[in-house]
Amino acid sequence: MSVADIKKSAEQKMQKSIDAFKADLAKVRTGRAHTGLLDHVQVDYYGSMVPISQVANLGLADARTISVQPWEKKMVSAVERAIRDADLGLNPATMGEVIRVPMPPLTEERRKELTKVVKSEGEDAKVAVRNVRRDANEQFKKLVKDKAISEDDERRGQDEVQKLTDRFVAEVDKLVAEKDKEIMTV
């Protein structure tokens, strides 16, 4: 394994950490409606749990309402129950074959709680990125010990991985700041 391989592997792992963090951020409810909020909702479809997107069309009725239209009439109550049980603080209402999910406005207290959650998840993402850096540095040390690379190459590799770490940590900070702003905007 070369310095370039370790760097490439570290970059891919760091990107996966950022992608996972972005997915976590999408689940944090702001005052605005977006279909991504329901992405992780699982519906009981004839005995097996499937994502809501596989049994219904998701759309936006307006800025504060998600509309969910199950493909089968008999799935309406199961989809509504799944949304209610998803622990998102949402109260869906069925109108014929369409389920409307209004976004209740967030209280100031709830907004502050959500910003704490976002910051905590941001710290977790930074820790994940730093763990990748630590693993890469350990691989460099092992290569030096095995005399596969020189100490200069090790230092160069560690510097490059540190630059990657700085870049990804800055991206996490940027995402946290954007989400905080989105949450605190009334």
UniProtKB/Swiss-Prot annotation:
Biological processes annotated in GO: cytoplasmic translational termination
SUPFAM superfamilies: Ribosome recycling factor, RRF
Keywords: Cytoplasm, Protein biosynthesis
GO molecular function: ribosomal large subunit binding
Pfam families xrefs: RRF
InterPro entries found in the cross-reference section: Ribosome_recyc_fac (IPR002661), Ribosome_recyc_fac_dom (IPR023584), RRF_sf (IPR036191)
Any single GO CC term annotated in Swiss-Prot or TrEMBL for this entry: cytosol
Compartments, as annotated in UniProt: Cytoplasm
Family to which this protein belongs: Belongs to the RRF family.
PANTHER family with a match to the protein in the record: MITOCHONDRIAL RIBOSOME RECYCLING FACTOR PSEUDO 1 (PTHR20982:SF3), RIBOSOME RECYCLING FACTOR (PTHR20982)
HAMAP family: RRF
Function: Responsible for the release of ribosomes from messenger RNA at the termination of protein biosynthesis. May increase the efficiency of translation by recycling ribosomes from one round of translation to another.
Protein name: Ribosome-recycling factor
Gene behind the chain: frr
